């Protein structure tokens, strides 16, 4: 279906140059200069949605075309000259660029506030899927007692999916910004602290826990104190979300995820609740 959509869009000589890049919600291809993100017919609307959210984030100039037709949707963008996040490519310039990018996103207001009901509902789902893991259940109960810390926060524009595959670092010698986020379909209103927590658990943790914490806290220095304090809630919550995802979506990976992520979640909660640290 992806090939059919592109055949209707591209001349044969360009079609022959396409190389697959992967992708979960869509199939992604490049001809070296452009990226073609192809959505299935039932998700064709996501091409336009992602283009609008890229524009909201300040990346509208990268969008070249949005095509929606009988075969599905296609988002065409300029190719960013970089590769997915990797520890060996992470530098002080990378960290500064990440800080600037997330601060810029989180200045953009979104309607509504984060509600206590949605946070408790999320924790209940985690309790159900992790019902046979006593330490995880204890953490769920502890976070329920602290839910007031995060409830009532005004929503800001967040990417909400900054795992390593979506965070591109500029190739050495290339021009343009140091970092770029792809996959904006999930972007929307949320708590900036959750966005930073997702960045830690999905990307920064590849640096090792000590370096990941240091990078997170260095970024968070520029945020309001309240955002920094809510990391104590959202980082453990995000690890629980990861465990819930593995248990329900990819159970074969759950034992390893449990071994890697639960100790980090418990340690982060222990180290930053109660909030003794002078942020």
Language-model segments: what does each one mean?
Residues 193-223, 236-253, 263-264:
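Active-site activation/catalytic loop segments of kinase-like enzymes and analogous catalytic loops
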Residues 66, 81-137, 153-155, 186-190:
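A cross-family kinase active-site recognition segment
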Residues 157, 180-183:
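Pre-DFG segment of protein kinase catalytic domains
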Residues 2-9, 110-160, 164, 169-173, ...:
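An alpha-helical support segment within catalytic cores of ATP-dependent transferases
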Residues 10-30:
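ATP-binding glycine-rich phosphate-binding loop
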Residues 69, 74-88, 125-126, 240-255:
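A glycine-centered beta->alpha junction motif in the catalytic cores
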Residues 41, 179, 186-189:
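Activation segment
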Residues 34-76, 85-105:
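A conserved alpha-helical element in kinase catalytic cores
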